[in-house]
């Protein structure tokens, strides 16, 4: 897009040499460190850092222009003055997506968005050139920046969309314009704003209002809330799950320990067996979602199987690390009651001393104490050997675990730092260690400590 075109799309005013108005931007960035020749830098006033202070830096790095909410007295490069930088970014992303018009698979749900996104992208990549959401770029800014990474040669986009309030999905889906909507499940996340699972269902299904003509809806048919979804805007949902009533279902499910989980997948086109190389029963659901999407877009069952079996784990998302001293399951990117219990169920399949290192789960609303206790009860009955946890809410978790199994070794610490100070003394060589907590607990620091244990 040219600077003149961008100014028009985002409703801004261009300031700079007339001849620069027809210059094409090479990329759009909000991180000043990534700005280079031909970049358009969007200055966003953040809570901690105001992007406007970096305008001189990006100009010296060769940026073509900047978008600013502030009038610049001595602009170091051409700029476009706007009322709201975030609104400008979203307007540009929405326009850019419309121009490309490539098929988009939009993924949402309470649990498993990222692992489902990775699975679907791995499947589709067996036939198409696929761009997928990086890391956790699933909010309005992250989605917009992902859209800007699309190029004409890309054949499909797999975009993750995360929300925590009503109306957010409308804004995300307006940008993404999905052709296919995939909803993984309706759990107990973001209850502070959405209040109930019915509220979560309402917020997630806002995505349906933005599906393209002749779109697809793919949902978890085993989920009691999603199973109530009927035909929407003339689109009949397709279901996946473990119940054979679903169009896509799985049986013969067997844990292969930390090697993964095997199953047989049934589709309207036939059946096949697969070894999913990431542990956990929840991964079967991800494979089923990937299978359904793959069939929608013309992949053979052999291509789908290949995509599933070559799937790779992502750091912080059940990523297995062999340190030489321990086996560490890095699942600390985020946590909620459903995913916490699922991860504990995988840990119990491990060979060796099974240790859960857990932390507080956030955004659970008024039921937070009860939900932590529920996870604690599960920890006390699922067959692990030790539970070490930290955080004020985990006090409820630890107490419930001990009540469920008085013989279970349980230690609770006030905070992560206290836990980290004692953890090396509590662990034994050969331990199989699950590390999981909500992102704000920063349990990645525990993983880093365990990774370096062999080098001490």
Regions found by a protein language model. Name each.
Residues 7-8, 88-216, 225-233, 425, ...:
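Phosphate-binding loop of NTP-binding sites
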Residues 430-451:
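Peripheral docking tails and interdomain loops at the edges
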Residues 9-13, 68, 72-76, 182-328, ...:
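Acidic, Mg2+-coordinating active-site environments of NTP-dependent enzymes
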Residues 6, 39, 58, 92, ...:
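Residue-level signal for inorganic ion chemistry
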Residues 48, 314, 332, 336-405, ...:
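Active-site beta-alpha connecting loops in nucleotide-dependent enzymes
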Residues 34-43, 130, 148-156, 344-365:
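Mobile, glycine- and charge-enriched loop segments
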